[in-house]
Amino acid sequence: MSSTSLYAAIDLGSNSFHMLVVREVAGSIQTLSRIKRKVRLAAGLNSDNTLSAEAMERGWQCLRLFAERLQDIPPTQIRVVATATLRLAVNAGEFLAKAQEILGTPVQVISGEEEARLIYQGVAHTTGGADQRLVVDIGGASTELVTGTGAQTTSLFSLSMGCVTWLERYFADRSLTKENFDLAEAAAREVLLPVADVLRYHGWKVCVGASGTVQALQEIMMAQGMDERITLAKLQQLKQRAIQCGRLEELEIEGLTLERALVFPSGLAILIAIFSELNIQCMTLAGGALREGLVYGMLHLSVEQDIRSRTLRNIQRRFMIDTEQAQRVGGLASHLLSQLDGSWELDPLSRDLLLSACALHEIGLSVDFKRAPQHAAYLVNNLDLPGFTPAQKKLIATLLLNQTNAIDLSSLHQQNAVPPRVAEHLCRLLRLAILFASRRRDDLLPAIQLTAQDEQLTLILPGNWLDEHPLGREMVDQECQWQSYVHWILRVASGDTLK
């Protein structure tokens, strides 16, 4: 691979230093390496905003690691930015001079507004869902809040509060008491007060979080089998659990890594304040943030309206999926679904995820026909799919695992993107669409009617279709059997005959 196709973005944050190395592939980016080190620079700021020698040394030590990787990348394709702590530090010049010497490239201290803009761009390029969004990023020493539509921001704010500074200020004794949480939340709400009205005025349809705190919450919820949406009720539950633990060094929550535990309570307090003050109903994890914003900025790639569609097209191209067949199966699945509108109510996101599964259902063939569903599930689980959250990826993989033959009901119940019953409905529709499109010709698709009464499905096929298609009849009989094994009732009507 030529080094000229490589790009690097480095973010000198207040809690961690990050480096992202990518290459451009089909209008998107392919991640080649990510390096992250907890430097906790903000913890080295004293009351006069002077950065301690120890904190600076921790930072320089990390940059020596990064410098080795940067030697392979053209300087014009590297961007290094520093955020809140180095905006505040009165002796930032000393740190930056040596940082530039180590890296061999300029380090730009960006304003809070510029940081917010870049975070939003990173989210816009990598996160699916509704166009009108609120983006929240809780850093080590600042918190960015941005509203926008598509690629355009409508308001951006960078506030002086972060998980490291709040840790030092409100949890300095490492005690996880209700009093400490109350103080931290009240202080965060005070910081939010001047900007809350403007953010609410611009409004949003979806809220996404793009920080380590939100990543930690996602990991906790996945580990505990909850759905991936972050709500105030879940945040309050986690706060109670932290208070029960009593002390920071004794904080144990299933799914919370040791690395994230130190700044988790302070980040949690800030997030609870944001949810309460802005009346946020739910939040999901963003696909990217500041570093992705830097990289996409260097590549001058425009923001696509539908990131999920771009991702699916790229995957289809890469794995040489038959797109006509994928569309055929998707069209039939949509047709079947539209007939069940009154009985099986599926929300727009569930419909989208069903069509995404249709688009990728033959990806397993790129490995081998034998065990193709298992190959498909493995690939989808392990591919980078911009626009899809981890839980959505898991659902699509689970649907593909169950697209034919025996049904693994437990896998449908273990995913946490949609309720188990919805996953079952999506699976049944996908299987029927694949079965009836198996001849791979539009003119051979039968005119199917589908009705549902609770969990019982009735398929009504035209006239003599079953008599004229002996293989089709066999496949339908087999499908009825597969579904009956997991207590799904599928009845088939042809004319006046009901099976």
From Swiss-Prot:
Pathway it works in: Purine metabolism; ppGpp biosynthesis; ppGpp from GTP: step 2/2
Highest taxon above the source species: Bacteria
Pfam families: Ppx-GppA (PF02541), Ppx-GppA_III (PF21447)
GO molecular function: guanosine-5'-triphosphate,3'-diphosphate diphosphatase activity
Gene3D superfamilies: 3.30.420.40, Exopolyphosphatase. Domain 2 (3.30.420.150), Hypothetical protein af1432 (1.10.3210.10)
A biological process from GO: guanosine tetraphosphate biosynthetic process
E.C. number(s) listed in UniProt: 3.6.1.40
InterPro entries: ATPase_NBD (IPR043129), GppA/Ppx_hydrolase (IPR050273), Guo-5TP_3DP_PyrP (IPR023709), Ppx_GppA_C (IPR048950), Ppx_GppA_N (IPR003695), PyroPPase_GppA_Ppx (IPR030673)
Family: Belongs to the GppA/Ppx family. GppA subfamily.
Name under which the protein is recorded: Guanosine-5'-triphosphate,3'-diphosphate pyrophosphatase
Lineage: Bacteria, Pseudomonadati, Pseudomonadota, Gammaproteobacteria, Enterobacterales
